[in-house]
Structure formats: structure tokens, C-alpha cells
């Protein structure tokens, strides 16, 4: 057998399995379901809700050092930590780093939660409870939207974290205390 025939036969032996693998991978990629939103509890890509905003945080996903680490939801959480005195204003950057983890653990411990430094379902639920009690939330339904003032008792009304969402349900937006800009509380992007 000539060297060119041997080479051709060897190439066919390699090419056929490679082609079959490429076809299989292409079919798998074409039929794969799209990636789920990063929010692990309700599948939404944003903090969202319907009806009264007081219970909107009860099913939110985690933000921590390994999940949704850089996101607008992390930025939202950092605004809460800032208002409660656990994080400096300069620490509001939408990136869940060591300072945010430490502040989160302190916030959790002061509220009798497991101080693991991860803002997950129990932590967001606790923050949501505070909307209706200690944090003096009020709602205004002007313009077809809820406008909620989120503030600890020691914070003046004019310094509250402003939060809004459509009256009939949808994504939350908040006024970032560091930048003064409105941000949609998204898990998959960081507009902090």
C-alpha cells in the first residue's frame, strides 16, 4: 500500500468519528434548553412581585461570594446594608466581595439568622418583613406603580431607599444611594 493511500485511510479513520462527534454536539447544542435565570428560587431574572410589595422578597435568589456575585441584586442588597450601617457608601458597587460578606454576616447575626454571609432566601425574607414593620415602608400607587420608601427607623424619610415596581406586578427598580441613579434589580447584569 502506498504512503498516500495509507495516509488517506488513516485520515478517514480519524475523520469519521470526529464528524459524528461534531454532529452530536451540534444536535445537543440546538436542542438544549436555554440557561435559567440566576435567581434560584423562582426563576425570575429580577427581583419582582405582584400585589403588595411587602412579600416580594420572600422568594428571591441568593447573592454571595459564588452566586450572583456581580449583579444589580447585589447592589440592591448593598444599599440595604448601607442604610443599616453595615457597609460604607463606597462599598456599594454590585460586587459581592469580602466586605459585603462580613457586613451580611453581621446583619444576619443581629437579626437572629444564621450568620453565613450569604444573602439568600431567609435573609431576603427578613428584609421583606422589615419593609412592613421596622423600616416604615409606605406605598404610593401613582402612575400605575408602587413607590416604596425603605428605611430603618434611624434614617430620615428623605434618605430612604426608594423602590418602585409596576402596580400589576413586575421587576423592582431602586434608587442607588451611591450614584443617585435608578437601577433595575437584575440577577444577570450589574448596572450599579
Predicted region positions:
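Secretory targeting and sorting signals
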Residues: 1-37
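Short, functionally important structural connectors and interaction interfaces within domains
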Residues: 22-23, 55, 88, 111
Amino acid at each position: 500500500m502506498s504512503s498516500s493511500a495509507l495516509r488517506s485511510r488513516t485520515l478517514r479513520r480519524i475523520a469519521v468519528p470526529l464528524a459524528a462527534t461534531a454532529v452530536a454536539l451540534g444536535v445537543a447544542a440546538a436542542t438544549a434548553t436555554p440557561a435559567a435565570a440566576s435567581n434560584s428560587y423562582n426563576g425570575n431574572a429580577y427581583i419582582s412581585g405582584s400585589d403588595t410589595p411587602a412579600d416580594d422578597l420572600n422568594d428571591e435568589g441568593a447573592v454571595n461570594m459564588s452566586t450572583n456575585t456581580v449583579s444589580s441584586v447585589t447592589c440592591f442588597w448593598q444599599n440595604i446594608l448601607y442604610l443599616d450601617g453595615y457597609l460604607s457608601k463606597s462599598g456599594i458597587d454590585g460586587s459581592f466581595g469580602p466586605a459585603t460578606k462580613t457586613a451580611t454576616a453581621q446583619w444576619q447575626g443581629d437579626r437572629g439568622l444564621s450568620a453565613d454571609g450569604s444573602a439568600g432566601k431567609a435573609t431576603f425574607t427578613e428584609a421583606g418583613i422589615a419593609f412592613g414593620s421596622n423600616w416604615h415602608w409606605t406605598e404610593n400607587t401613582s402612575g400605575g406603580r408602587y413607590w416604596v420608601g425603605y428605611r430603618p427607623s434611624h434614617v430620615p424619610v428623605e434618605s430612604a431607599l426608594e423602590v418602585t415596581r409596576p402596580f400589576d406586578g413586575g421587576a423592582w427598580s431602586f434608587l442607588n444611594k451611591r450614584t443617585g441613579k435608578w437601577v433595575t434589580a437584575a440577577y444577570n447584569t450589574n448596572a450599579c
